[in-house]
Amino acid sequence: MHFVAVYILTHFHAYPGVAALPFFSTLPKITSCCDHYVVLNSLSSVSSSTPTCLDGEXLFQNAGQKFCRPFTDNRTIVYTMQDQVQRPWSVTWMDFNLVISDYGRAVIENLTESAMSAHKNGPRYLQMETFISDLFRYECHRDNRYVLEKKLQMFYPTTHMNELLFYPSDPTLPSPYGNGHY
């Protein structure tokens, strides 16, 4: 089944209302289960915690590899991107923690029709199962956390000539894929 990567990025903090984050921003916190939980937060720090998935939190298993549902908290990181070249409009994206949840999938499905009908050059489709599998597979290479950021760049293109929403937290680092391969 294909889903649309449509994304509103709102940022809920102690203040009321929604604030748009800058276009060049760091990645939101992502937690997954490899040999143990791996956390990539907005400070680009990696840490580990419990060695196994929490009960009921396993998404699926593949060749002995267990994939856990990422932890979520009461903060939702949202980004709003405007196309300043043509007519301005917001590209709606799902926060990763919501994307792989049942709730997130339902939201994406509901957004698909409205997004595609509102913009003739609507957002791209992606296969969520492949997205999740590849994302976790690359995230498990914990010795280079920037691979995850590059992976998000590949799977979260905007509708404007593959312009990327997410940028590496340290753009001076070489690409883990080498020679500009995304």
UniProtKB/Swiss-Prot annotation:
Glyco sites are at 74, 110
Manganese listed as a keyword: no
UniProt keywords, alphabetically: Glycoprotein, Late protein, Membrane, Signal, Virion
Question: This chain belongs to which protein, by name?
Answer: Glycoprotein Q2
The role this protein plays is: Plays a role in virus entry by participating in host receptor binding at the cell surface.
Signal sequence region: 1-20
> For this protein, what post-translational modification is recorded in UniProt?
Glycosylated by host.
Q: Which GO terms describe its cellular component?
A: host cell endoplasmic reticulum-Golgi intermediate compartment; membrane; virion membrane
Q: At the top level of its lineage, which domain of life is listed?
A: Viruses
Provide the protein's localization.
Virion membrane; Host endoplasmic reticulum-Golgi intermediate compartment
Task: Tell me how this protein assembles.
Answer: Interacts with isoform gQ2. The heterodimer gQ1-gQ2 associates with the glycoprotein complex gH-gL to form a tetrameric complex. The gH/gL/gQ1/gQ2 complex binds to host TNFRSF4.
